[in-house]
Amino acid sequence: AEKIKICLQKQVNSSFSLHNGFGGNLYATEEKRMFELVKPKAGASVLNQSTWICFGDSRTDQSNSAFPRSADVSAKTAEKFRSLSGGSLMLSMFGPPGKVDYLYQGCGKHKVFYEGVNWSPHTAIDCYRKNWTDIKLNFQKSIYELASQSHCMSLVNALDKTIPLQATKGVAKNCNNSFLKNPALYTQEVKPLEQICGEENLAFFTLPTQFGTYECKLHLVASCYFIYDSKEVYNKRGCGNYFQVIYDSSGKVVGGLDNRVSPYTGNSGDTPTMQCDMLQLKPGRYSVRSSPRFLLMPERSYCFDMKEKGLVTAVQSIWGKGRKSDYAVDQACLSTPGCMLIQKQKPYIGEADDHHGDQEMRELLSGLDYEARCISQSGWVNETSPFTEEYLLPPKFGRCPLAAKEESIPKIPDGLLIPTSGTDTTVTKPKSRIFGIDDLIIGLLFVAIVEAGIGGYLLGSRKESGGGVTKESAEKGFEKIGNDIQILRSSTNIAIEKLNDRISHDEQAIRDLTLEIENARSEALLGELGIIRALLVGNISIGLQESLWELASEITNRAGDLAVEVSPGCWIIDNNICDQSCQNFIFKFNETAPVPTIPPLDTKIDLQSDPFYWGSSLGLAITTPISLAALVISGIAICRTK
């Protein structure tokens, strides 16, 4: 009788790469990185479509006769905007004669501002000031700052006030023979005796606690006053020094100018200019005192509920060719902590006309149609990978990827897999399966004559004396690795929290240290991924070994007395007693009875909100659905034949 030895053969050559894991190793024909690097998309986006609002002008106004050609946003996004063609927040605050006066108001955790161009050098608004850019800069900066701390905001276009009897509303030639709606100009007639200057003005205004349905915890008020170059310019009529001062209810000065105690500019001009400072005032009653002849009275404000911290995005608002723009919006956002600025790289070129419907701006704002996982000064990301090639510039919010080099991301085995600790087998693409018995048999059986001396390859066994790793030792190993991961996270969190405490009140320090902190977070995450990779490799290896043990048991049971298992994974068969069809029955049963495969593990990593720019106390914030408890062998289902 001719006896032959049939074994499960190790099929590893130079094309395989070795992957070491906790509890077992693998050879693989391919490998892939656990995550690919993502690249942010330029422009604006939002984290949640249900919690944002926008303020705009004709470029976002659905009622514009040229819409949608006039728009820089989609029709869907335009519905989120509070817009009117020709409008701007500053125009509504001051109300220059002949300009659009729109009631801007709305609520949202994330506020996007795409307006401002309608008050620019091109509009040539005068009213005692040739250049309003500095005032616009301070106004926009104050709006962004307060909006980032509020859920709701609203223009208050009519403050309650009390005006002295001797003062009447005035006009100015350099203001289209009219004047601003805010502040309003009140004057005293001193004719026919011009040397009589009139009486000091005393007026009152009230900032409400509520305007319509909008709660007001803080108001943005323009404190405006005239600036005279010398006492003589104001004092042509012998009227003393100029002053215009705002007091709170306790008599404390909160704004204005008093040339009785402050010097004049010393310049040689004959015409005063008007200055407006932006004050943040609580609701209440305020008084205004001014020198005779002129009174500038606050009659409007923007009110904010100050209920929650939120996100602010400011979009560069400039004209197309032929019109002069300013860059107050850009400068205001860049000088406001937490404000994200969207800027063009090319001149504005409109579709509807030179100033409406720019393709580059449409691309930059197209992200507003979607929800992003991360928004930052560098752009927005909606992919789930935790890594990006370059550091994302702050401010940034959401689940933002960390900067990492591609070569630093751990690789996991792919393609054909063969465990090295006591067995050999194959598996197709682990992204669709981990292992299955039908993968283990096809192409792996070979027949060898006993005399050739080809021995079997050790197969993992349930017994301590077997060639594999026991469940008990693997469980202990995984438990230790799990504890190590928790220690790594805890120590990293503690270090970052200490940094947070040091820099929580210093925005510049935050910016200086952010890169260093992010590098630490990235290194810690990469360290965790290395541990998780090793767990996965060991888990798959041990699982394959266990599955082969089950396969060997099934083969032995099918063979009965026809084959004798002489070593783990090897059997002696009498070729005269068990012919080819008999051997096929014993060793190739999977061809007629395929076994279901095991579902793949979920290896997704999820970065939580950035702790430095979202006001969060989180440190190294990563979560993963890979439960360490689920990685131990006792928690893994092994394919078994019936």
From Swiss-Prot:
Highest taxon in the source lineage: Viruses
Cellular component, GO, one term: viral envelope
Transmembrane segments: 618-638
Record membrane topology: Single-pass type I membrane protein
Entry annotation: catalytic residues: 353 (charge relay system), 356 (charge relay system)
Disulfide bonds: 197-239, 216-303, 224-276
Family: Belongs to the influenza viruses hemagglutinin family.
Role, per record: Binds to the N-acetyl-9-O-acetylneuraminic acid residues on the cell surface, bringing about the attachment of the virus particle to the cell. Plays a major role in the determination of host range restriction and virulence. Class I viral fusion protein. Responsible for penetration of the virus into the cell cytoplasm by mediating the fusion of the membrane of the endocytosed virus particle with the endosomal membrane. Low pH in endosomes induce an irreversible conformational change in HEF2, releasing the fusion hydrophobic peptide. Several trimers are required to form a competent fusion pore.
Protein name, UniProt field: Hemagglutinin-esterase-fusion glycoprotein
Protein species of origin: Influenza C virus (strain C/Pig/Beijing/115/1981)
Taxonomic classification: Viruses, Riboviria, Orthornavirae, Negarnaviricota, Polyploviricotina
Gene: HE
